[in-house]
Amino acid sequence: MIVKFSWFAVTGLSNLLELLQFPFMQRAIAGAILMGILGGFLGSFVTLRQLSFFSHAVGHAALVGVALGVLLQLNPTWMLLPFTLVFGLVVLYLIDQTNLSSDSVLSVVLSGALAIGVILSSLIQGYRGNLMGVLFGDILAIDTSDLILTGLVLIGSIIFLLPTLRQQILLTLNPTMAQVQGIPVRLYRYAFVVLLSLAVAVAIKAVGVL
């Protein structure tokens, strides 16, 4: 029994090492590591600032960007970035400028974006491989440009959050006190939403919109 187990262990290890020699597997592992670090770095602030539904809404609304990319015969990833960025900023602006709660604004905008995304998806003729791949995700389909984008977003997050960590923590726990102390609350909020939107966009190809 021990001999059989050892043989299976050696065989499994050799197969794993053989898999790691393929470039697509190396990119998948590198992408998973980068996204894990990025998610952990931003996730604490997302949870404490109650932005979980916001990031969820950005991911689902990205269906519009994906459908537009397929219709225009462009790389869906490059359409995702500007769309999720604009969507996040517009939602935050509406939350600041209206008396509605953030959940109400997110629900309305998300429903509208999903409706537009479904309409655009129905206009796509023929093969929908790009659309399906982004909807459900495929970490093995990550290419070098995706790794570069994820790395850039991670570097940008580190550059923004680490030097201002004390201010970010105070802003997270007590926004009023942060504003009294002269911290640019509005600027920091919008900058964080930009990073969060970009993080969602670069992760969609691996984990999917749905």
Where are these regions (language model features)?
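Structural signature of hydrophobic alpha-helical transmembrane segments
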Residues: 25-36, 74-86, 151-155, 202-210
